[in-house]
Swiss-Prot record:
HAMAP family: 16SrRNA_methyltr_G. This is Ribosomal RNA small subunit methyltransferase G. The keyword DNA damage does not apply. GO terms for cellular component: cytosol. It comes from Staphylococcus aureus (strain MRSA252). Specifically methylates the N7 position of guanine in position 535 of 16S rRNA. The lineage of its organism: Bacteria, Bacillati, Bacillota, Bacilli, Bacillales.
Length: 239
């Protein structure tokens, strides 16, 4: 009944799950657990917890941001595909690119996309710092990341990939406000401007989430992102 639980939760936000989408989520869960036995994809494997803390949590940004349009999305450090694969299942017209530094995860995502019959998805084995210096720099409508690093660090990894006029959608847990304050300098330096913040609770008291929508107002200076590892070691902070 877990996929039916997800359907009920989404219905409260006027989102209807089709039978195809239900089957896709069921397949996603099965493959996630199977592959997780061979490699570390997630510490969450209980079926209900996966639907709540991975699937629902990944779809929740669509309550506050319009993903129902033909936009290109880059998901930085998506791990087992969160949030972009659940979003792709819900909004099939999205063009999704996932960048991840671990090749094993890319292998899983390629197999997953094939089994789910997803079109317009690509998975790239690279560090975000290197990827952001290449041909895809400033080419995406939306770049997203889900709690992979502090916001000051995430901004340097993500904002260089956002096209001018696009958005960086940052998904954080409950300490997001502190991180946002610390990250404002970096966001400004990298050409961004925070335009919306949303705070919401997951169902069943599963925790608070915060979502920041950052508009790309100016081009990112060419020197960013810095070389791999530097953003994490020495984040861009106001001196």
């Amino acid at each position: 009944m877990t996929v039916e639980w997800l359907a009920e939760q989404l219905k409260e936000h006027n989102i209807e799950l089709t039978e195809t989408q239900k089957q896709q989520f069921q397949t996603y869960y099965r493959l996630l657990v199977e592959w997780n036995e061979k490699m570390n994809l997630t510490s969450i494997t209980d079926e209900h917890d996966v639907y709540l803390k991975h699937f629902y949590d990944s779809i929740a940004p669509s309550f506050y941001f319009d993903f129902n349009q033909p936009i290109s999305i880059c998901d930085v450090g998506a791990g087992a595909g969160f949030p972009s694969i659940p979003l792709k299942i819900m909004f099939p017209q999205l063009k999704v690119t996932i960048v991840d530094s671990l090749n094993k995860r890319i292998q899983f995502l390629n197999y997953l996309a094939s089994e789910l019959q997803l079109q317009d998805v690509s998975f790239i084995h690279d560090r975000a710092e290197t990827f952001g210096k290449g041909v895809y720099r400033e080419s995406y409508d939306v770049v997203t990341a889900r709690a992979v690093a502090r916001l000051s660090v995430l901004s340097e990894l993500c904002l260089p990939l956002v096209k001018k006029g696009g958005q960086f959608v940052a998904l954080k847990s409950s300490k997001g406000e502190e991180e946002l304050e610390e990250a404002k300098f970096a966001i400004s330096v990298l050409g961004g401007n925070v335009t919306e913040t949303h705070t919401f609770e997951l169902p069943e008291d599963a925790g608070e989430r915060q979502m920041f929508i950052i508009d790309k107002k100016r081009q990112t200076p060419k020197k960013y992102p810095r070389k791999p590892g530097t953003p994490n070691k020495t984040p861009l902070l106001e001196k």
